[in-house]
Amino acid sequence: MNLHEYQAKQLFARYGMPAPTGYACTTPREAEEAASKIGAGPWVVKCQVHAGGRGKAGGVKLVNSKEDIRAFAEQWLGKKLVTYQTDANGQPVHQILVEAATDIDKELYLGAVIDRSSRRVVFMASTEGGVEIEKVAEETPELIHKIALDPLTGPQPYQGRELAFKLGLTGKQVGQFTKIFMGLATLFLERDLAMVEINPLVVTKQGDLICLDGKLGADGNALFRQPELREMRDPSQEDAREAHAAQWELNYVALDGNIGCMVNGAGLAMGTMDIVKLHGGEPANFLDVGGGATKERVTEAFKIILSDDKVKAVFVNIFGGIVRCDLIADGIIGAVEEVGVNVPVVVRLEGNNAELGAKKLADSGLNIIAATSLTDAAQQVVAAVGAK
Protein backbone atom coordinates (compact mmCIF):
# COMPACT_ATOMS: atom_id res chain seq x y z
CA MET A 1 0.00 0.00 0.00
CA ASN A 2 1.45 3.35 -1.06
CA LEU A 3 1.15 6.68 0.74
CA HIS A 4 1.02 10.19 -0.64
CA GLU A 5 4.02 12.49 -0.33
CA TYR A 6 2.30 14.71 2.24
CA GLN A 7 1.49 11.65 4.37
CA ALA A 8 5.09 10.46 4.16
CA LYS A 9 6.33 13.86 5.32
CA GLN A 10 3.91 13.84 8.25
CA LEU A 11 5.54 10.59 9.36
CA PHE A 12 9.01 11.99 8.67
CA ALA A 13 8.33 14.86 11.07
CA ARG A 14 7.30 12.46 13.83
CA TYR A 15 10.59 10.63 13.47
CA GLY A 16 12.69 13.78 13.63
CA MET A 17 13.40 14.13 9.92
CA PRO A 18 13.43 17.66 8.45
CA ALA A 19 11.11 18.53 5.54
CA PRO A 20 9.89 21.83 4.05
CA THR A 21 6.93 23.49 5.74
CA GLY A 22 3.86 22.51 3.75
CA TYR A 23 0.12 21.87 3.74
CA ALA A 24 -2.06 19.44 1.78
CA CYS A 25 -5.03 21.32 0.32
CA THR A 26 -8.27 20.16 -1.28
CA THR A 27 -9.55 23.50 -2.65
CA PRO A 28 -7.95 26.48 -4.42
CA ARG A 29 -8.85 28.69 -1.45
CA GLU A 30 -7.10 26.35 0.97
CA ALA A 31 -4.03 26.41 -1.27
CA GLU A 32 -3.90 30.22 -1.15
CA GLU A 33 -4.35 30.20 2.62
CA ALA A 34 -1.55 27.65 2.95
CA ALA A 35 0.82 30.04 1.19
CA SER A 36 -0.09 32.74 3.72
CA LYS A 37 0.64 30.36 6.62
CA ILE A 38 4.02 29.43 5.14
CA GLY A 39 5.07 33.04 4.60
CA ALA A 40 6.82 34.81 1.77
CA GLY A 41 7.32 32.97 -1.52
CA PRO A 42 8.42 31.44 -3.72
CA TRP A 43 6.46 28.25 -3.13
CA VAL A 44 6.29 24.83 -4.72
CA VAL A 45 2.93 23.25 -5.56
CA LYS A 46 2.66 19.50 -6.14
CA CYS A 47 -0.16 17.23 -7.29
CA GLN A 48 -0.59 14.33 -4.86
CA VAL A 49 -0.85 11.03 -6.73
CA HIS A 50 0.69 7.59 -6.25
CA ALA A 51 3.04 7.89 -9.21
CA GLY A 52 6.44 9.27 -10.10
CA GLY A 53 7.24 11.56 -13.01
CA ARG A 54 4.93 14.31 -11.77
CA GLY A 55 7.31 17.12 -12.65
CA LYS A 56 7.66 16.15 -16.31
CA ALA A 57 3.87 15.83 -16.54
CA GLY A 58 3.29 19.35 -15.20
CA GLY A 59 2.20 18.18 -11.76
CA VAL A 60 4.96 20.07 -9.89
CA LYS A 61 5.54 23.79 -10.29
CA LEU A 62 7.56 26.60 -8.72
CA VAL A 63 5.32 29.65 -8.25
CA ASN A 64 5.89 33.22 -7.10
CA SER A 65 2.36 34.45 -6.41
CA LYS A 66 -0.80 33.27 -4.69
CA GLU A 67 -2.65 33.82 -7.95
CA ASP A 68 -0.41 31.20 -9.56
CA ILE A 69 -1.12 28.83 -6.67
CA ARG A 70 -4.88 29.26 -7.16
CA ALA A 71 -4.53 28.76 -10.93
CA PHE A 72 -2.51 25.56 -10.41
CA ALA A 73 -5.06 24.21 -7.94
CA GLU A 74 -7.96 25.04 -10.26
CA GLN A 75 -6.12 23.37 -13.13
CA TRP A 76 -5.50 20.07 -11.33
CA LEU A 77 -7.93 19.44 -8.47
CA GLY A 78 -10.54 16.95 -9.60
CA LYS A 79 -8.57 16.16 -12.76
CA LYS A 80 -6.31 13.23 -13.63
CA LEU A 81 -2.53 13.40 -13.93
CA VAL A 82 -0.92 11.15 -16.54
CA THR A 83 2.76 10.31 -16.03
CA TYR A 84 5.09 7.65 -17.40
CA GLN A 85 4.22 5.54 -14.33
CA THR A 86 0.42 5.67 -14.79
CA ASP A 87 -1.77 4.16 -17.47
CA ALA A 88 -3.35 6.28 -20.19
CA ASN A 89 -6.18 7.28 -17.87
CA GLY A 90 -3.87 8.73 -15.22
CA GLN A 91 -4.60 9.08 -11.51
CA PRO A 92 -7.04 11.52 -9.87
CA VAL A 93 -5.72 14.57 -8.04
CA HIS A 94 -7.62 15.27 -4.81
CA GLN A 95 -4.91 17.16 -2.90
CA ILE A 96 -2.34 19.79 -3.76
CA LEU A 97 0.73 20.06 -1.52
CA VAL A 98 1.86 23.67 -1.05
CA GLU A 99 5.40 23.99 0.33
CA ALA A 100 8.04 26.60 0.95
CA ALA A 101 10.61 26.58 -1.86
CA THR A 102 14.09 25.32 -0.99
CA ASP A 103 17.43 26.73 -2.17
CA ILE A 104 19.14 23.57 -3.43
CA ASP A 105 22.90 23.16 -3.56
CA LYS A 106 23.11 19.39 -4.00
CA GLU A 107 20.67 16.50 -4.53
CA LEU A 108 21.22 13.12 -2.89
CA TYR A 109 19.27 9.87 -2.73
CA LEU A 110 18.39 7.78 0.32
CA GLY A 111 16.10 4.77 0.27
CA ALA A 112 15.49 1.34 1.75
CA VAL A 113 13.90 -1.92 0.66
CA ILE A 114 13.66 -5.47 1.94
CA ASP A 115 16.35 -7.46 0.14
CA ARG A 116 14.96 -10.97 -0.19
CA SER A 117 18.32 -12.52 -1.08
CA SER A 118 20.04 -11.36 2.12
CA ARG A 119 16.79 -11.30 4.15
CA ARG A 120 17.73 -7.89 5.49
CA VAL A 121 16.51 -4.33 5.26
CA VAL A 122 19.03 -2.70 2.94
CA PHE A 123 19.61 1.06 2.77
CA MET A 124 20.86 2.65 -0.42
CA ALA A 125 22.42 6.09 -0.75
CA SER A 126 23.75 7.91 -3.78
CA THR A 127 25.07 11.29 -4.86
CA GLU A 128 22.82 10.97 -7.93
CA GLY A 129 19.63 12.31 -6.35
CA GLY A 130 16.69 13.70 -8.28
CA VAL A 131 16.79 10.98 -10.95
CA GLU A 132 15.39 7.45 -11.12
CA ILE A 133 17.52 5.20 -8.94
CA GLU A 134 16.85 2.32 -11.38
CA LYS A 135 18.62 4.33 -14.08
CA VAL A 136 21.59 4.96 -11.78
CA ALA A 137 21.75 1.25 -10.89
CA GLU A 138 21.83 0.34 -14.57
CA GLU A 139 24.29 2.94 -15.83
CA THR A 140 26.56 3.73 -12.85
CA PRO A 141 25.99 1.09 -10.13
CA GLU A 142 29.23 2.07 -8.40
CA LEU A 143 27.54 5.32 -7.33
CA ILE A 144 25.03 3.45 -5.14
CA HIS A 145 26.27 2.69 -1.62
CA LYS A 146 24.51 0.02 0.45
CA ILE A 147 24.18 -0.79 4.14
CA ALA A 148 22.30 -3.83 5.50
CA LEU A 149 20.61 -3.64 8.89
CA ASP A 150 21.28 -6.44 11.35
CA PRO A 151 17.87 -7.75 12.49
CA LEU A 152 19.18 -8.23 16.05
CA THR A 153 20.87 -4.87 16.64
CA GLY A 154 18.82 -2.72 14.27
CA PRO A 155 20.18 0.49 12.73
CA GLN A 156 23.39 1.87 14.22
CA PRO A 157 24.67 5.47 14.07
CA TYR A 158 28.02 4.33 12.69
CA GLN A 159 26.21 3.02 9.60
CA GLY A 160 24.71 6.46 9.01
CA ARG A 161 28.12 8.09 9.37
CA GLU A 162 29.64 5.56 6.97
CA LEU A 163 27.06 6.42 4.31
CA ALA A 164 27.49 10.15 4.96
CA PHE A 165 31.24 9.95 4.34
CA LYS A 166 30.67 8.00 1.11
CA LEU A 167 28.32 10.77 -0.05
CA GLY A 168 31.02 13.37 0.55
CA LEU A 169 29.24 15.06 3.45
CA THR A 170 31.31 16.94 6.01
CA GLY A 171 30.99 18.76 9.33
CA LYS A 172 27.47 19.18 10.69
CA GLN A 173 26.04 17.44 7.61
CA VAL A 174 27.36 14.09 8.86
CA GLY A 175 25.38 14.43 12.08
CA GLN A 176 22.28 15.60 10.22
CA PHE A 177 22.46 12.69 7.78
CA THR A 178 22.96 10.20 10.60
CA LYS A 179 19.86 11.53 12.36
CA ILE A 180 17.84 11.19 9.14
CA PHE A 181 19.20 7.67 8.58
CA MET A 182 18.31 6.57 12.11
CA GLY A 183 14.86 8.16 11.89
CA LEU A 184 14.13 6.58 8.52
CA ALA A 185 15.33 3.15 9.65
CA THR A 186 13.21 3.33 12.81
CA LEU A 187 10.20 4.42 10.76
CA PHE A 188 10.78 1.55 8.33
CA LEU A 189 10.89 -1.08 11.06
CA GLU A 190 8.20 0.25 13.40
CA ARG A 191 5.68 0.86 10.63
CA ASP A 192 6.24 -2.41 8.72
CA LEU A 193 7.26 -0.70 5.51
CA ALA A 194 8.27 -2.51 2.34
CA MET A 195 9.93 0.46 0.66
CA VAL A 196 10.92 4.02 1.49
CA GLU A 197 12.56 6.65 -0.69
CA ILE A 198 13.76 10.21 -0.19
CA ASN A 199 14.55 11.44 -3.67
CA PRO A 200 15.91 13.98 -3.51
CA LEU A 201 17.43 14.42 -0.08
CA VAL A 202 18.91 17.87 -0.63
CA VAL A 203 21.75 19.90 0.78
CA THR A 204 20.58 23.53 0.91
CA LYS A 205 22.65 26.59 0.08
CA GLN A 206 22.99 27.02 3.86
CA GLY A 207 24.53 23.53 4.12
CA ASP A 208 21.58 21.79 5.80
CA LEU A 209 19.91 18.53 4.80
CA ILE A 210 16.16 18.47 4.02
CA CYS A 211 13.86 15.68 2.83
CA LEU A 212 12.46 17.34 -0.27
CA ASP A 213 10.34 14.39 -1.40
CA GLY A 214 9.07 11.24 0.26
CA LYS A 215 7.71 7.94 -0.96
CA LEU A 216 6.52 5.18 1.36
CA GLY A 217 5.15 1.72 0.62
CA ALA A 218 3.66 -0.30 3.47
CA ASP A 219 3.63 -4.09 3.61
CA GLY A 220 0.01 -4.99 2.91
CA ASN A 221 0.36 -8.20 4.93
CA ALA A 222 1.17 -6.18 8.06
CA LEU A 223 -1.62 -3.61 7.83
CA PHE A 224 -3.68 -5.51 10.41
CA ARG A 225 -1.28 -4.17 13.07
CA GLN A 226 -0.86 -0.70 11.54
CA PRO A 227 -4.29 0.93 12.02
CA GLU A 228 -2.94 4.44 11.42
CA LEU A 229 -1.50 3.46 8.06
CA ARG A 230 -4.76 1.74 7.12
CA GLU A 231 -6.54 5.05 7.68
CA MET A 232 -4.12 6.72 5.26
CA ARG A 233 -5.14 4.45 2.37
CA ASP A 234 -6.45 6.31 -0.68
CA PRO A 235 -8.65 3.91 -2.69
CA SER A 236 -9.00 6.48 -5.48
CA GLN A 237 -5.36 5.82 -6.41
CA GLU A 238 -5.95 2.09 -6.85
CA ASP A 239 -7.54 0.16 -9.68
CA ALA A 240 -11.17 -0.34 -8.62
CA ARG A 241 -11.07 -4.01 -9.56
CA GLU A 242 -7.85 -4.59 -7.63
CA ALA A 243 -9.30 -2.91 -4.54
CA HIS A 244 -12.47 -4.99 -4.77
CA ALA A 245 -10.44 -8.18 -5.24
CA ALA A 246 -8.41 -7.44 -2.10
CA GLN A 247 -11.63 -7.43 -0.06
CA TRP A 248 -12.16 -11.05 -1.13
CA GLU A 249 -8.50 -11.99 -0.52
CA LEU A 250 -7.94 -12.34 -4.25
CA ASN A 251 -4.63 -11.24 -5.74
CA TYR A 252 -5.63 -9.36 -8.89
CA VAL A 253 -3.57 -7.14 -11.18
CA ALA A 254 -5.16 -5.58 -14.26
CA LEU A 255 -3.28 -5.89 -17.56
CA ASP A 256 -3.93 -4.75 -21.13
CA GLY A 257 -4.90 -7.98 -22.91
CA ASN A 258 -8.23 -9.65 -23.67
CA ILE A 259 -7.91 -13.13 -22.09
CA GLY A 260 -9.05 -13.20 -18.48
CA CYS A 261 -7.05 -15.59 -16.29
CA MET A 262 -8.16 -17.25 -13.04
CA VAL A 263 -5.54 -19.46 -11.43
CA ASN A 264 -4.69 -20.82 -7.97
CA GLY A 265 -1.13 -20.04 -6.98
CA ALA A 266 1.06 -17.09 -7.98
CA GLY A 267 3.67 -19.22 -9.75
CA LEU A 268 1.08 -21.09 -11.78
CA ALA A 269 -0.64 -17.79 -12.56
CA MET A 270 2.58 -16.36 -14.00
CA GLY A 271 3.18 -19.57 -15.94
CA THR A 272 -0.37 -19.38 -17.28
CA MET A 273 0.21 -15.86 -18.56
CA ASP A 274 3.47 -17.00 -20.15
CA ILE A 275 1.84 -19.86 -22.04
CA VAL A 276 -0.99 -17.60 -23.21
CA LYS A 277 1.65 -15.22 -24.60
CA LEU A 278 3.57 -18.15 -26.11
CA HIS A 279 0.54 -19.13 -28.18
CA GLY A 280 -0.15 -15.59 -29.37
CA GLY A 281 -2.63 -14.37 -26.76
CA GLU A 282 -2.58 -11.39 -24.40
CA PRO A 283 -3.55 -11.82 -20.72
CA ALA A 284 -6.09 -9.31 -19.40
CA ASN A 285 -5.09 -9.84 -15.80
CA PHE A 286 -3.16 -11.74 -13.16
CA LEU A 287 -5.58 -13.37 -10.71
CA ASP A 288 -4.59 -15.80 -7.97
CA VAL A 289 -7.58 -17.21 -6.07
CA GLY A 290 -5.21 -18.75 -3.52
CA GLY A 291 -5.02 -22.18 -1.96
CA GLY A 292 -8.21 -21.79 0.07
CA ALA A 293 -10.52 -20.93 -2.79
CA THR A 294 -14.23 -21.17 -2.02
CA LYS A 295 -17.24 -21.23 -4.31
CA GLU A 296 -18.04 -17.65 -3.28
CA ARG A 297 -14.52 -16.39 -4.03
CA VAL A 298 -14.47 -18.11 -7.41
CA THR A 299 -17.81 -16.50 -8.26
CA GLU A 300 -16.46 -13.11 -7.19
CA ALA A 301 -13.29 -13.70 -9.22
CA PHE A 302 -15.42 -14.26 -12.33
CA LYS A 303 -17.31 -11.04 -11.67
CA ILE A 304 -14.07 -9.09 -11.33
CA ILE A 305 -12.57 -10.57 -14.50
CA LEU A 306 -15.72 -9.90 -16.53
CA SER A 307 -16.01 -6.33 -15.25
CA ASP A 308 -13.16 -5.61 -17.68
CA ASP A 309 -14.81 -4.82 -21.02
CA LYS A 310 -11.69 -5.93 -22.90
CA VAL A 311 -12.08 -9.57 -21.82
CA LYS A 312 -13.14 -11.77 -24.76
CA ALA A 313 -12.49 -15.18 -23.14
CA VAL A 314 -11.68 -16.61 -19.71
CA PHE A 315 -8.96 -19.17 -18.98
CA VAL A 316 -9.41 -21.06 -15.68
CA ASN A 317 -6.31 -23.06 -14.72
CA ILE A 318 -6.57 -24.97 -11.44
CA PHE A 319 -4.12 -27.40 -9.87
CA GLY A 320 -5.88 -29.21 -7.04
CA GLY A 321 -3.52 -29.55 -4.13
CA ILE A 322 -5.07 -27.85 -1.13
CA VAL A 323 -8.12 -26.80 -3.10
CA ARG A 324 -10.45 -29.45 -4.55
CA CYS A 325 -11.15 -29.26 -8.27
CA ASP A 326 -14.78 -30.28 -7.81
CA LEU A 327 -15.36 -27.26 -5.53
CA ILE A 328 -13.76 -25.03 -8.13
CA ALA A 329 -16.06 -26.59 -10.73
CA ASP A 330 -19.06 -25.75 -8.52
CA GLY A 331 -17.82 -22.16 -8.31
CA ILE A 332 -17.32 -21.94 -12.07
CA ILE A 333 -20.81 -23.31 -12.76
CA GLY A 334 -22.37 -21.00 -10.17
CA ALA A 335 -20.52 -17.99 -11.52
CA VAL A 336 -21.44 -18.70 -15.14
CA GLU A 337 -25.10 -19.09 -14.13
CA GLU A 338 -25.17 -16.07 -11.80
CA VAL A 339 -23.12 -13.62 -13.83
CA GLY A 340 -24.40 -14.66 -17.23
CA VAL A 341 -21.04 -15.20 -18.90
CA ASN A 342 -21.23 -14.38 -22.59
CA VAL A 343 -17.63 -15.16 -23.50
CA PRO A 344 -15.93 -18.54 -24.02
CA VAL A 345 -14.67 -20.18 -20.82
CA VAL A 346 -11.79 -22.66 -21.12
CA VAL A 347 -11.06 -24.74 -18.02
CA ARG A 348 -8.08 -26.92 -17.22
CA LEU A 349 -8.34 -28.93 -13.98
CA GLU A 350 -5.53 -31.11 -12.64
CA GLY A 351 -4.94 -32.84 -9.32
CA ASN A 352 -7.28 -33.32 -6.35
CA ASN A 353 -10.71 -34.50 -7.62
CA ALA A 354 -9.91 -33.28 -11.15
CA GLU A 355 -11.97 -36.02 -12.82
CA LEU A 356 -15.00 -35.25 -10.63
CA GLY A 357 -14.60 -31.56 -11.40
CA ALA A 358 -14.40 -32.22 -15.14
CA LYS A 359 -17.52 -34.41 -14.95
CA LYS A 360 -19.45 -31.65 -13.16
CA LEU A 361 -18.49 -29.19 -15.88
CA ALA A 362 -19.46 -31.62 -18.63
CA ASP A 363 -22.83 -32.37 -16.98
CA SER A 364 -23.65 -28.70 -16.39
CA GLY A 365 -24.89 -28.14 -19.92
CA LEU A 366 -23.09 -24.78 -20.00
CA ASN A 367 -20.80 -23.53 -22.75
CA ILE A 368 -17.58 -24.43 -20.96
CA ILE A 369 -14.62 -25.86 -22.89
CA ALA A 370 -12.77 -28.57 -20.94
CA ALA A 371 -9.09 -28.78 -21.88
CA THR A 372 -7.00 -31.93 -21.67
CA SER A 373 -3.68 -30.22 -20.88
CA LEU A 374 -2.14 -26.82 -20.20
CA THR A 375 -0.99 -26.46 -23.80
CA ASP A 376 -4.39 -27.53 -25.11
CA ALA A 377 -6.10 -25.00 -22.83
CA ALA A 378 -3.86 -22.14 -23.96
CA GLN A 379 -4.37 -23.00 -27.63
CA GLN A 380 -8.15 -23.25 -27.20
CA VAL A 381 -8.54 -19.95 -25.35
CA VAL A 382 -6.37 -18.09 -27.88
CA ALA A 383 -8.37 -19.67 -30.72
CA ALA A 384 -11.63 -18.70 -28.99
CA VAL A 385 -10.54 -15.06 -28.84
CA GLY A 386 -9.48 -15.14 -32.47
CA ALA A 387 -12.86 -16.53 -33.49
CA LYS A 388 -14.81 -13.72 -31.82
Curated annotation (Swiss-Prot):
Give the record's cofactor note, including how many are bound. Answer: Binds 1 Mg(2+) ion per subunit.
Residue positions binding substrate: N264, G321, I322, V323
Q: Is Magnesium a UniProt keyword of this protein?
A: yes
Sites where the protein binds ATP: K46, G53, R54, G55, E99, T102, E107
Q: Which reaction does it catalyse?
A: succinate + ATP + CoA = succinyl-CoA + ADP + phosphate; GTP + succinate + CoA = succinyl-CoA + GDP + phosphate
Q: Where is the ATP-grasp domain?
A: 9-244
Oligomer and partners: Heterotetramer of two alpha and two beta subunits.
Its function, per the record, reads:
Succinyl-CoA synthetase functions in the citric acid cycle (TCA), coupling the hydrolysis of succinyl-CoA to the synthesis of either ATP or GTP and thus represents the only step of substrate-level phosphorylation in the TCA. The beta subunit provides nucleotide specificity of the enzyme and binds the substrate succinate, while the binding sites for coenzyme A and phosphate are found in the alpha subunit.
Q: Spell out the molecular function terms from Gene Ontology.
A: ATP binding; magnesium ion binding; succinate-CoA ligase (ADP-forming) activity; succinate-CoA ligase (GDP-forming) activity
Q: Which InterPro entries match?
A: ATP-grasp (IPR011761), ATP-grasp_succ-CoA_synth-type (IPR013650), ATP_grasp_subdomain_1 (IPR013815), Succ-CoA_synthase_bsu_CS (IPR017866), SUCC_ACL_C (IPR005811), Succ_CoA_ligase-like_bsu (IPR005809), Succinyl-CoA_synth-like (IPR016102)
Q: Between which residues do disulfide bridges form?
A: none
Any one GO CC term of this protein is:
succinate-CoA ligase complex
For the ligand (Mg(2+)), the binding residues are: N199, D213
Q: Which Gene3D superfamilies match?
A: ATP-grasp fold, A domain, ATP-grasp fold, B domain, Succinyl-CoA synthetase domains
According to UniProt, the name of this protein is: Succinate--CoA ligase [ADP-forming] subunit beta
- Coiled-coil portions: none
